[in-house]
Amino acid sequence: MAEAHITLSPKVTHEQQTDIDSECEITEVDDENVNENKSQEMIQDIPARDREEIENITRTFVELQENYRLIEKIGEGTFSSVYKAEDLHYGRYINDWDIQSEVLKESSFGKEKIPVNEDSRKPKYVAIKKIYATSSPARIYNELEILYLLRGSSVIAPLITALRNEDQVLVVLPYYEHTDFRQYYSTFSYRDMSIYFRCLFQAMQQTQTLGIIHRDIKPSNFLFDVRTKHGVLVDFGLAERYDGRQQSHSCRCTNSNAAELAHDFSIAQETSLGYIKNDTRPSKRANRAGTRGFRAPEVLFKCSSQSPKVDIWSAGVILLSFLTKRFPMFNSKDDVDALMEIACIFGKSEMRQCAALHGCTFETNVSTLTEKRVNFRKLILWASCGSASIYKEKLRHKPSQEERLCLDFLEKCLELDCNKRISAEEALDHDFLYLDNLAYEKKDDDTAFDNSFGETSFEKDEDLTAKHLSHILDFKEQEETDEPTSLSKRKRSIDEILPNDALQDGA
């Protein structure tokens, strides 16, 4: 099958091209030879395995050689690999997606557009995502369609173009300069976090407005540049459509009296624990997509009526990593371990209520788990302080206004009941996301702080608390795959990349 390609982005007009050529002083003397020499030099510097992959991709896609020069592999995941490439014909197209040509810089006075004085002849980069052939046509089609719908946003990586050769699909996305999460998560101030999450929730609000659940919110999928204080949401490989009006009502959580029903259900379960012998009921099925450690409770309990609130929970886990200076915060191997890690913080009582909300039962004989939840502030201080003396000293001080707003925002994001969890739109009205624009007194505010998240106290039972939290607070770094993005042009018809017959064959 021949390569499928249709260019949708407008080409530069003759007058515009004349201006571009004049401004950029473009010269095309021995261009092909220069590009070939550069390509040979770059290929020699990369690992043999990656070099072989790049050569195979280049041979498979003829048009790729004409428009891009693959440089290196920058990411690898379950369903795809990502490569950095140079866009050889950047100046020939209108690149309205290129937000890095005018960087947005955050300041205490709000957003200021800071023009970047770059050499116009400096290489422009893109990220080329190779989707593995094991992905179904329906999954690939869904990702391309969602990327196309989300075009035009400064906080979401858009689709530039896509190529297909038989069962091989390449997606071309912008490449964004960004800082590795591990380099800054332990040093960010409250105001830095405020800017980070304002940008993230702006992206989430835009996806949710279009009825899209990202399903894989995590640091490696939000490319944040510490220098410009701007971030971009990427990787919609697990994203799906959501329509609240057509939402399945098979789960108890969608009932208007869900909380009361869950309470009654949990009480009834206490007197009838056990398994039904020769149970003929069908197994519970639900979308469980996502990255371990970032999946919401309703995903772990296999709720069949999941909403965009699953993304809010994931964002809350990222915030908890910032505050505790622990990453990854959760590091479970399976769903059962994941529920136990959450129970270490929220306690058995609230976990039973949450399970009942989705028609499940939560019971455990782990003696170190407490009935009531751990106070968020105490948890954060305990995890981030280097010693017990420092912890007790900080605990004696009243929290600042910034800290109170941050804790309130955290509590609203990490709400076990998905019906009560804050939405992206509501989050954007929260004062925590605007700390850089608000004036605060340096001294601690004397207003009373609501410390009633739970009565589990580090002073009362510090040894027990440390014991049942130790397995989630003593982490080794989890290897994550960044799947960044780069810079280029040209959008294609999704139907041309994956025609209807291919979609039906893979359905």
Curated annotation (Swiss-Prot):
Keyword Phosphoprotein: yes
SMART domains: S_TKc
Record bears the keyword Transferase: yes
Keywords on record: ATP-binding, Cell cycle, Cell division, Kinase, Nucleotide-binding, Nucleus, Phosphoprotein, Serine/threonine-protein kinase, Transferase
Residue positions binding ATP: I74, G75, E76, G77, T78, F79, S80, S81, V82, K129
Mod. after translation: Autophosphorylated. Phosphorylated by cds1 in vitro.
SUPFAM superfamilies hit by this protein: Protein kinase-like (PK-like) (SSF56112)
GO MF term list: ATP binding; protein serine kinase activity; protein serine/threonine kinase activity
Catalytic activity: L-seryl-[protein] + ATP = O-phospho-L-seryl-[protein] + ADP + H(+); L-threonyl-[protein] + ATP = O-phospho-L-threonyl-[protein] + ADP + H(+)
EC identifiers of the protein: 2.7.11.1
Active site residues of this protein: D216 (proton acceptor)
Outcome (variant: K129A): Reduced activity
Annotated ranges, domain Protein kinase: 68-433
Subunit structure: Heterodimer with the regulatory subunit him1/dfp1. May form homooligomeric complexes. Interacts with mcm10.
Similarity-based family: Belongs to the protein kinase superfamily. Ser/Thr protein kinase family. CDC7 subfamily.
PANTHER family: CDC7 KINASE, ISOFORM A-RELATED, OVARIAN-SPECIFIC SERINE/THREONINE-PROTEIN KINASE LOK-RELATED
Purpose: Required for G1/S transition. Plays a role in DNA replication checkpoint signaling through regulating rad3 and cds1. Involved in the maintenance of mitotic chromosome structures during S phase through regulating the function of rad21. Required for initiation of mitotic DNA replication through phosphorylating mcm2/cdc19. Required for genome integrity.
Listed name of the protein: Cell cycle serine/threonine-protein kinase hsk1
Lineage per the UniProt record: Eukaryota, Fungi, Dikarya, Ascomycota, Taphrinomycotina
